[in-house]
């Protein structure tokens, strides 16, 4: 008899709780309105982060600067697994990341074209987000190599020409790496490099710009 009474009290308590939650939810949703839009509003200004300025179209979503958010919990754990796994150690096993005679570190190098920035984009971001001193130092080795490769006319990086036309795909990817590095460091050299490089690009005739298949299909 005592067990039946306890069971009835438990059921009544559960029903009462569900009823209260339902009433609260109904009251809340009744006072709210739902508006469907094709895309997020871009009229308002984000005071914390800079979006594109005119004449460029404002961004619907603003990418947060690398390192502005510190990961915790399982996200941090997975990033640490990347650091301790292939991403963090690819330089030890990849022929393309071999520093000796690498085209990003040595003028006239014979390897390491787009493969280096493909890897460095993720590796550098991982270093900044985890604030890992060893990885940051490795990243800066390559970034300093980029700065050292700058030429008086604004060009930077490996020189790879086909029929008098320079292949620019590797530089296009490295610009992403430099963007992340600037977000992390605010190093003015990044702005100077990009400004000079884009001025150089403006001097390239249209029939010689992005003519290679690989960069033309993506650039």
Residue ranges and their predicted role:
Residues 13-23:
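Bacterial N-terminal signal peptides
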Residues 17-18, 28-219:
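Glycan-recognition and catalytic cores of secretory/periplasmic carbohydrate-active enzymes
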Residues 2-14:
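Bacterial N-terminal signal peptides that target proteins for export
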Residues 11, 25-28:
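N-terminal export/targeting leaders of redox proteins
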